[in-house]
Amino acid sequence: MASAEVFKANVEAVTRDYICEPRIEYRTVGGVSGPLVVVELVKRPKFAEIVNIRLGNGTSRRGQVLEVDGNRAVVQVFEGTSGIDNRNTTLQFTGEVLSTPVSKDMLGRVFNGSGKPIDGGPTVLAEAYLDIQGSSINPSERTYPEEMSQTGVSTIDVMNSIARGQKIPLFSAAGLPHNDIAAQICRQAGLVRQKAQDSMIDAGREEEEFAIVFAAMGVNMETAHYFKQDFEENGSMEKTVLFLNLANDPTIERIITPRIALTTAEYLAYECGKHVLVILTDMSSYADALREVSAAREEVPGRRGYPGYMYTDLATIYERAGRIEGRKGSITQLPILTMPNDDITHPIPDLTGYITEGQIYVDRQLHNIQIYPPINVLPTLSRLMKSAIGEGMTRKDHSEVSNQLYDNYAIGKDVAAMKAVVGEEALSSEDLLYLEFLDKFERKFVNQGHYEARTIFDSLDLAWTLLRLFPKELLRRITAKTLEKMYERSES
C-alpha cells in the first residue's frame, strides 16, 4: 500500500466515531390487538425498523414498527401474536429495515411468504441483502415498454399483447380457473425476437434471459401443491422462484410476501439482466390482510372497510414493474385478483384498474360453456399493446387483425342478443355470418388446451382462418394492401 493511502487510512481510523448504542431488551408490552403489539417506554424507536421478539417458551419471531408516538411503538408481528404476554416476552429493536437475501441461486427454489426455503434444500447463499420496499427509481430513467412478452395464449398475445415492463392484472372470481391460467402462463411465457432478413420467428423461451417470480398469498395446501408439482413436471421450475404464503400462515405475512418477491425480481432483472415475469396471486388476500391491520390499528375505514390508503399501498407494489435506462432486464407484472361476488366495481379491482395498464377479464359465462381459458376480450384491455407489436416486433398485420377480431366479435355478440328477441328466421345472411364467426371464435380461437402453447404467429394464422369466413368487403378494419397479401380463401 502506498504511503499516502496508509496515511489516509490512519487519519480515518483516528477521526472515525466508534460510539455505538447497545441493543436494549424490553419487557414493556403494553397490549396486543390482532397482529399488533404495543410496546411502551422504548428509547428512540424508528419507523419501519425490525424488532426481534422472544417469547417465554424460547421461540423467536420478527416484527416491524408500524407507528411511533414518542416512546411508544406499535409493532406488527409477521408470525402472529399468539402466545405473546407482558411478563416473559422480550423485544429488541434492531434499528434496521426489513431486508431479504437475494441470489441468482434462488431460481428453481421454493420459499415461504417470509422468504425462507421450504423445499428441503440448503439456505441460499446471499449475494446481496436488499430492502424489501425497493429502491427509488428516477422517473426520467424509466424506459417505455416496447417489446412483447409472449404468453402462448391467443386471446392475450393477439388481442391484448403484453409489453415487457408492463403491469396488467387478471380480474377473476371465485370458482374460475385463474390458477390454471397462471400456471399455463408460467409454463409458456417467453420472448419473441426478430430473425435475419426481416422475418420473425418464435424465440422459443430463451432460458438464459427469461425468469419467473411467482408469489401466492393466502392459497390452500392443494393449490400450493398444484403449482409446485406443475412447475416441476414441465421443467419450468428451473427458471422460477416460488413464494408460497398458505391460508393457515399468519395473515400479516401476506403484507411482505409480494414485496419480497418483487425485490427478488428487481435483483434478477437489474443486476442479472433477466426479463422477469412476476405473477402475484391472490391480491384480494393481500388487500384483506391490509384491512385486518388497519382495523387492528383502529384507523378510520374507507369503502367496505378497506383503509383509505389502499390505493397508495397497492401502487407501491404495482409501480415496481418496468424497465430502467442502461439496464438489460425488465419486470413485467401479472397480478391476479378475485373479484368478490363478481363485482368489478369492488374497491380492489377498481383501484387496481386505476394504477395498472389495462386488465385481463376472466368471464364466468364462457367458463360455464366449457371454454378455457375463459377470457372475455371485450372488457379486456392492454394500454401498451400498440408499442409492443407490429413490423420488427411481431408481424405487420398484427394490429389490423386484432382490430378486426374485436369488431366482428362485438357485432356477433349484438346479433346473438338480437336473435334471442326476434328469432333466427328474422336475421339476414350477413347476421348469420357473424353468428357463425362468434361460435367459431369462442370454440377455436379463445378455447385452447391447458398444455397447448401457441406462438404469436400460430395465433395470427388462426385468426386469419376465422376472418376468411367473411368477404373482403366486410373486413373494414384491414387495409386493402394487407388483404391483398394475406387474404386467400381455401378452395376446400
UniProtKB/Swiss-Prot annotation:
Gene3D superfamilies: 3.40.50.12240. It comes from the Eukaryota. Coiled coil: none annotated. One of its GO terms (biological process) is ATP metabolic process. Keywords: Hydrogen ion transport, Ion transport, Transport. GO terms for cellular component: proton-transporting V-type ATPase, V1 domain. GO terms for molecular function: ATP binding; proton-transporting ATPase activity, rotational mechanism. Pfam families: ATP-synt_ab, ATP-synt_ab_N, ATP-synt_VA_C. CDD domains: ATP-synt_V_A-type_beta_C, ATP-synt_V_A-type_beta_N, V_A-ATPase_B. V-ATPase is a heteromultimeric enzyme composed of a peripheral catalytic V1 complex (main components: subunits A, B, C, D, E, and F) attached to an integral membrane V0 proton pore complex (main component: the proteolipid protein). NCBIfam families: PRK04196.1, V-ATPase_V1_B. Belongs to the ATPase alpha/beta chains family. Non-catalytic subunit of the peripheral V1 complex of vacuolar ATPase. V-ATPase is responsible for acidifying a variety of intracellular compartments in eukaryotic cells. This is V-type proton ATPase subunit B 2. It comes from Acetabularia acetabulum.
